[in-house]
Design a protein with these regions (language model features):
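Generic protein-terminus/edge-of-domain signal
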Residues: 1-74, 80-81, 89, 115, ...
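Regular secondary-structure segments
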Residues: 54, 126, 143-154, 201, ...
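Ligand-binding loop in jelly-roll beta-barrel domains
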Residues: 80-104, 110-113
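An amphipathic alpha-helical interaction segment
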Residues: 120-188
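Basic/polar phosphate-binding segments, predominantly the helix-turn-helix DNA-binding elements
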Residues: 174-180, 199-249, 259-261, 265-296
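Intrinsic-disorder/low-complexity linker and hinge segments
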Residues: 187-195
Length: 299
């Protein structure tokens, strides 16, 4: 299953369902060229995530870190960290995602398993992410298990839920056996940059349909305009203005696909001052006009 455009709330938290309460895991393959902007923009979720590149080359950004992954390599992204994925090649770039809530492997609330082997790792500010490579035995083992999980999830043979559970437990054991953290120095808090970015994202998502001033954004995190721009560009790898454009374009997609509103109405509804400017930016970002996109995606 492809998740084309990730739904996020005003705090940049992803609102896509990652499985169900009884079985809190979702496995899917992302084809970046099928996303309207050609990449997966910044978001975060409570679930931990394993990714395995199945085609092409992909840049993964996690907080201030950037990883370039080739086909066959993977990445672990911890709970609650902002992340983004961009293709490096013009042709098909894809990766398998495994998202699961760690309650799934925690036995029960208050258990030794949860207290000793799960919570210290997902709450740690020492582990935001790490790359999985084929030439490291324990990492290669996790990559094999990602492939196995993908197969189990879609074949759905007898006992597949149980087999998925066992495989996840084994993957988690690989991690805690090889990634060492100083539990005495463990801090639950994320970096100040991470928290400030979430405040900026929240402000943009609450106000994208209106005119947004840089001064207002800077005031939300108590920095001057220059410091605010520098922080954003350093971490998000684009300007605040560019991000706002991308967010407005993404928000307009639902209107194009699911309403009969005119292009002008959609432009104004999503914060563009004129329909011509909306069409110009839309074509620049997607290589097609809003009308062409609507015709291709009529329900």
């Amino acid at each position: 299953m492809q998740i084309y455009n990730i739904k996020i709330d005003e705090n940049k938290k992803e609102t896509t369902n990652h499985g169900v309460y009884e079985f809190p895991i979702q496995i899917y393959e992302t084809f970046l060229e099928k996303n309207v902007l050609g990449f997966v923009n910044w978001h975060w979720h409570e679930e931990v995530q394993f990714c395995l590149v199945t085609n092409g080359r992909v840049d993964f950004y996690v907080s201030e870190n950037k990883y370039t992954l080739d086909k066959g390599q993977g990445i672990f992204i911890n709970s609650g960290y902002l992340h983004m994925a961009k293709p490096l090649e013009k042709e098909s770039n894809s990766y398998i995602c495994i998202d699961f809530n760690t309650k799934f492997i925690s036995s029960f609330q208050g258990s030794i398993i949860k207290q000793k082997y799960v919570d210290p790792y997902i709450q740690s500010n020492q582990i935001s992410s790490f790359v999985l490579k084929n030439d490291v035995n324990w990492q290669d083992s996790i990559l094999d298990k990602i492939r196995k999980l993908n197969r189990l999830y879609y074949e759905k043979n007898d006992l597949y839920e149980f087999d998925i559970y066992i495989t996840l437990i084994s993957m988690w054991r690989d991690i805690i056996s090889n990634i060492k953290i100083n539990k005495e120095k463990n801090e639950v808090v994320k970096s100040s940059d991470e928290n400030r970015l979430k405040v900026i994202f929240s402000y943009i998502h609450e106000n994208y349909m209106n005119k947004i001033n840089l001064e207002d954004i800077a005031n939300t995190i108590h920095l001057n305009k220059s410091e605010c721009c520098h922080l954003f560009k350093r971490n998000v790898k684009c300007t605040i203005f560019e991000y706002i454009q991308d967010y407005r374009i993404n928000k307009s997609i639902d209107f194009l696909k699911n309403t009969n509103m005119s292009i002008s109405e959609i432009a104004y509804e999503n914060g563009f001052c004129t329909s011509s400017y909306y069409c110009e930016i839309f074509k620049k970002k997607t290589n097609m006009t809003p009308k062409e996109y609507r015709n291709l995606n009529k329900k």
